Amino acid sequence: IIADEPTTALDVSIQYQILELLKEIKNLNISYKTRKETIVASSNVNFTLERGEILGIVGESGSGKSTIANAIINLIDPPGQITSGIIKIDNNELQNKEEIIQQIRGKKIGFVFQDPQTSLNPLFKIKDQLIETIQTHLNLSHDEALQKSINLLEEVGIENATKRIEDYPHQFSGGMRQRVVIALAISCEPDLIIADEPTTALDVSIQYQILELLKELTKKRNLGVIIITHDMGVIAETTNKVIVMRHGLIVEQGNTKDLLNNPKSSEARSLVISVPPTNKKIERFKLISPDGSEITSSSANLTKNIIKTWGVRKNTNQKLLELKEITKIFDDQSISYRKKIDDNAVKAVNNVSFKLFEGETLGLVGESGSGKSTIAKIITGLVRPSFGELEYNGLSLYNSRRKYQIDKSRGQIQMIFQDPYSSLNPRFKVRDIIAEPIKFFQKNITRNDLEQNVNDLIDIVGMTRKSLDRYPHEFSGGQRQRISIARALATRPRLLICDEPTSALDVSIQAQILNLLKDIQDE
């Protein structure tokens, strides 16, 4: 990064703060006050970050990781507030000093948010959003800002950047949207990068590129980087030191290598032991209870509730799903299916065929934009194929001679979406979100049975029943994903399509959910 007079327009005191950037947090306490109760999001948090360091903050969903990051740049949503403690940059307190925060936010502190869908403005092209950010903080002409924007997209791994920069956010896959967000964060050459789950939506090859980029920037520019993640692989490969959080408390912190090799707290042990081995297949993930003992069966009691309402199906080895030469073409010039395909059309799925039998688990893997999610949406009826045949349980749902007949399988095929926030109705409480599909497919269900089913489902995904009376925005990303899973299970599906179902979850919760899905399948 070449910084051309980066502090010329700032007064001397702010220049000093920026050039000697050092993040220090002392006894930080953050809480959310509601009418019924006060929820403590963080309690007595203490840590420092020096230039050239990469600090990892890891912990289960709802442990307070993202809240700490938002507090640093004064972006805590109401009714959240800092009740006590100190946040410093080079020994200068930032509380109630909005002018200083505005000077450094964006230009000297870059932020990568967890949810790329809600971080980008759906009404503006990527080009406009990048140029606006660059010209707000850097003295560049429109053409210079445009060229810098194209270079940034190429740097974060977006092919054909000159063309893609003209697209809107919805025209990118989840992983590609996250790359755009990262490009925005580094666009103004910051001194500190706060990355909240920066690689959650990216495939492994692009994850590696982004993490290498962060390490390279840290070394060349002598940056400070805070990475908030649930991915222990990211922690091991990238960070110098790590903080483990649980229920708003720091339960362990230290050198990354020492902590991973010899975790002392049960929380740290749980995160380390839940990482699956790459050299062998395992039947179940190991889990650690809060007292430090190993859990041999994580969901035995929960599956009893499933069997009670679901029933037990015999494994017949029956063919459940078949795709025959499925092709999907998106024409960016017209929404008409009858228009002749032109040179700008995107062939998202090309001649794909496979079968799935009852009791089987099929893994569909590929880089961002390879067509994985499009195939999932075709099977569930959210996207209509251009060509090919689709059969479910012996019924033809689509072929070249018939209308799309996805209603035949409605309810029996359910999907867990990649982005938990945009797939949940923000106006519904969790109770209503889970109950809605049950009421739709079981018209005559009694109120008591409905309530019992909802309670069982929220138990299954490891959340308290108090959460049923809250709204989606009141939860962390991982907790929202668990709500999505509960809703998908509500109709007792025969085929469950999981589009990155654990991407927003920490590794210990990933292990619980995957063990649970395996138990449901076995039953």
Named regions from a protein language model:
Residues 106, 170, 188, 473, ...:
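Conserved signature/switch motifs of ABC ATPase nucleotide-binding domains
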Residues 82-93, 388-398:
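Conserved ABC transporter NBD signature motif
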Residues 253-254:
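ABC ATPase "signature
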